[in-house]
Every structure is written in C-alpha cells, then in structure tokens.
Amino acid sequence: MANAVGKITQVIGAVVDVQFNDHLPEILNALETENDGKRLVLEVAQHLGEGTVRTIAMDSSEGLVRGQEVTDTDGPITVPVGPGTLGRILNVVGEPVDEGGPVDAEERRGIHQDAPEFADQSTEAEVLVTGIKVVDLLAPYSKGGKIGLFGGAGVGKTVLIMELINNIAKVHSGVSVFAGVGERTREGNDLYHEMIESGVIVPDNLPESKIALVYGQMNEPPGARMRIALSGLTLAEQFRDATGADVLFFIDNIFRFTQAGSEVSALLGRIPSAVGYQPTLATDMGTMQERITSTKRGSITSIQAVYVPADDLTDPAPATTFAHLDATTVLSRAISELGIYPAVDPLDSSSRLMDPTIVGDEHYQVARDVQGILQRYKSLQDIIAILGMDELSEEDKLTVARARKIQRFLSQPFDVAKVFTGSDGIQVQLEDTISSFKAVVAGEYDHLPEGAFYMVGGIDEVIAKAEKMAADAA
C-alpha cells in the first residue's frame, strides 16, 4: 500500500496539524514534508478526530503553509546505527551536521524502542574508576549504572563530563555516545575539536574513532530537544546489542529533555502540573531511563548532567531524575566560590556502591571518616563565624585544620581545564586515593600547610609542593 498523504491545516509554532482523508498515521509515526528544499520531519503526538493529527516539528516550521502535502512514513523516526556513525555528528533525525557527507550505515533503527526484559538485565555491581579523587573515594560510579551530575548554572557540569570522557573514553576499550540535549552550540563545537585533539575522533580514519555525537542544541525547536536523547540512546543500544560492548552514554543536559517536554506539552494544550511541568514528567523520564540498562550481552554506563534550576534540588525535574540513579555527584556553588574544583559536594553526593561488601572495608571506612570530619567542620562553621577559632577546643581546632586540608585535597587539576589552571591534568589511582586520605585522616600530615593540598594529585605531590613552598618562603 502506498504511504498515506495528508495536507497541513494549521501551523502554530512547532505544532503542525495535518488532515488525512483515508489512512490515519499512528501516534509517534514520522511524517515527512518539504520545507525550503529540505526534508522536514513531523512526529504524530495526538489524534484530534475527523482525520486530523497534531504533530511536533523536528526542525523550524517557518515557511510551512496550509494545504501543503505531508507523507506518512508508516513508522517512527529512524536514525542510522552501527560503526558508520563513529566520529560523526548527527541531528535528531539522523542527518549528519558535520559537513562530512552521508553516513555510511547499513542499518537504521526507530528511536522508540522497548526497554530490555527484566530477565535479560544484568545486576552485577562493579566500580568504574574515573581517576577523579572525590568521585572515586566518596561516591564511586558503577559500571553499567546511571550517574547524575547535579548543579546550577556555571558550577562545572560540562567540564566534569568532558573530563570523564577524556579519562574513561581514552582508557575504555568500548565506544561512547554523546547526546548534546539543548546545550550551548559553542560547547558542542569545543567538544568536537577536543575529541579530535585527544585522538578519540580520527577524522582521517573515522572507523577508528571511539565516539558518536548527536546534537540537539539550545536554538533548535522543542521537538528536536525532546527526542535527541532517544536518538543517542538508540545508537548506544545498537552498540551494546550488536557487539556486546560496554558503552558509555553521556547526556548533557537531561534537564533540557524535561524542559523541552514541558514546552511541547504546553503547545499540545495539556494542563501543566507542579511548577508548570508536563503532567507526564515521571512517565517521560521513566520511559527513557528504563532503556539505559545493562543486559547479559553488554552494558550501557550513562553519565547525565542535570541542571538544577535556581540551585533547588527539590524542583520536580531534578527530583524525578534522582529516583533513577545509582550514583549522584552534586556540584555546589559554595565550594566553587572557594575556588575548589571539581566543586563536588562531599556530603551531598552519594552512591549505591558505597557498601563494604562492594568497595571493601578499608575504602568504606576511609570514606566515612572523611565525611565525618567534613560534617563536624560544617557544624562548627556557625560558631567560628560568630566567636572565632580561638573559642574552639583543641580537639575541634585539629578537626577544622584537617577538614580544610581534606577539602583542598579533594580538588584536582583536569586535562580539559588546562586553559584555566595552567597545569596538566592528573588521574589518581584508586589505591593511592584511599591510602592518601587514610593518612590525612590519621593526622600523619598535620605538619604540612593546607595550601600544599590544593590542586594536586597524590600525597607525594603534596609533600613536594610543601617543600617547594618552604624553600620559596626561605
């Protein structure tokens, strides 16, 4: 049967109504039309009755006119998948946007897939070492798990994601997929060129590249921003299922997925729920997050940046995301104001792996001791602010001194932030991190100045920096 053809009856921004006289397209079907000489994809969102469907445009709808013909593709939006996508940048409908010619892919997949059956999912717990001290020590990431990076505007989510790509994608033998959801075009461009510089993308021999990129940037219509995460996820699922690989799936930023869903929901005339979000917020998030999982064939480890509106973690968007995560890394403005980067909050960040049966007794105990000292310091800060340090007991003075050293020791220079710090990035082995913090907690380095602990790797560098500071002072 020939694909059904309909006519546009109404255009309101990103929402386009199309009337079909015979065969009505199903919900989530992709429709195609010509706009300004380019293919425009519309996704069916509602059946309005009398042969009319309401659709969401995946690109700008400027230039569309009533009466224009639209063809039903008889299936969902599809994207190219497989090795041909490596080193390429695709948009939401799988078209290349890197001016590198057509994508050499043998297979296309629909972006709406069912999550794997429960019986097929893997439940093993294994630590994914990142080389970032504060993460590995206090809120370790799980291989095949979901990790959230929470933070307000400008506290370093994208820098942390780029460092994780740098640290893990380089040493990681599998492939990675990066979904840029509603973020800055400049950051997307910077990321692409950084990938080329670091050898993760090989422009002269694309099959050797280790990452595929899908972008739906801030300036794109809400339909594209809402579906781009699913396009990226479809690529990641194919790598996992076809090759049995361990896939890294980066999303920057998952909040924009929710935000775009909220815009689309309002355009479709749904009654908003709390704080103006769409009534289907939990369903939209759950449908996507359930697909990001590890099966017995391979794993998808997902690292998601989550923008926190007005630094309010109780906002429905970040709160809904929390429920799906194995580990949360919370970035704090108060810590970034102290100049400590990565600005990870050691007391707010958590991980399901922080269990002695998984990480071992020594790691668990050191992490709890570090958090205990930092928590005591936090509770003493009001007293210090009002009465000053002199009013504290000797024991509390020692706790404060150690806490300030620990706080600075949790900072670390990043490869991707070399432009800002002027020093090369350092990755620290997990064993070194544990032994270093164990010694600091035990008071073995109480004699060293706290400045020596700032922006260094292991404890050997602290000692070297302290000696240099002493020599400079003399």
From Swiss-Prot:
The protein's assembly and partners: F-type ATPases have 2 components, CF(1) - the catalytic core - and CF(0) - the membrane proton channel. CF(1) has five subunits: alpha(3), beta(3), gamma(1), delta(1), epsilon(1). CF(0) has four main subunits: a(1), b(1), b'(1) and c(9-12).
Protein name: ATP synthase subunit beta
Binding residues for ATP: G151, G152, A153, G154, V155, G156, K157, T158
Broad class of where this protein is predominantly found: membrane
Catalytic activity: ATP + H2O + 4 H(+)(in) = ADP + phosphate + 5 H(+)(out)
GO-annotated cellular components: plasma membrane; proton-transporting ATP synthase complex
Keywords of this entry: ATP synthesis, ATP-binding, Cell inner membrane, Cell membrane, CF(1), Hydrogen ion transport, Ion transport, Membrane, Nucleotide-binding, Translocase, Transport
Similarity comment text for this entry: Belongs to the ATPase alpha/beta chains family.
InterPro entries in UniProt: AAA+_ATPase, ATP-synt_VA_C, ATP_synth_F1_bsu, ATPase_a/bsu_AS, ATPase_alpha/beta_chains, ATPase_F1/V1/A1_a/bsu_N, ATPase_F1/V1/A1_a/bsu_N_sf, ATPase_F1/V1/A1_a/bsu_nucl-bd
Native source organism of the sequence: Jannaschia sp. (strain CCS1)
Disulfide bonds: none
